């Protein structure tokens, strides 16, 4: 489903997620905070490895990067993690360097900034103001 279809068919769920994307759980789903709790043990393993390749969903990568880079958890759902990209982390002393290497794959931009109007009674066009352009 597109963002527009979700906003149209499930306007209350769409608004509730917009209001608290960090903690919101879709029915039978996980919140970002649930994912953070699930991957914390994995993060401890990652810190002990020399080289590691992780292939994952954007949401999981947002959680990992937020924890590794020490970003505030409130920023987690809005971190830009581009599709079809190799993200290289280099650990040196107490610093982490991040490099993004985009692969030549055409795709839509799925990054959505935090909306300002999260009211459950908002109009469809207001709900979709921050929806990224797609074909």
Regions found by a protein language model. Give the residues of each.
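Generic structural signal for well-ordered alpha-helical scaffold segments
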Residues: 36, 40-47
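Generic beta-sheet signal
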Residues: 45, 49-58
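Short glycine/proline- and acidic residue-enriched helix-loop micro-motifs
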Residues: 13-31, 115
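A general structural motif at alpha-helix termini
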Residues: 10, 18-21, 39, 80
């Amino acid at each position: 489903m597109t963002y527009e279809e979700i906003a149209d068919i499930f306007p209350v769920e769409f608004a509730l997620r917009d209001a608290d994307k960090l903690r919101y759980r879709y029915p039978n789903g996980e919140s970002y905070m649930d994912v953070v709790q699930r991957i914390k043990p994995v993060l401890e393993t990652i810190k002990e490895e020399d080289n590691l390749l992780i292939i994952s969903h954007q949401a999981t990568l947002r959680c990992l990067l937020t924890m590794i880079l020490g970003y505030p958890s409130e920023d987690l759902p809005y971190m830009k993690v581009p599709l079809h990209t190799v993200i290289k982390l280099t650990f040196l002393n107490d610093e982490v360097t991040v490099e993004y290497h985009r692969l030549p794959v055409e795709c839509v931009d799925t990054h959505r900034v935090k909306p300002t109007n999260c009211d459950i009674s908002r109009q469809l066009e207001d709900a979709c103001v921050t929806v990224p352009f797609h074909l």
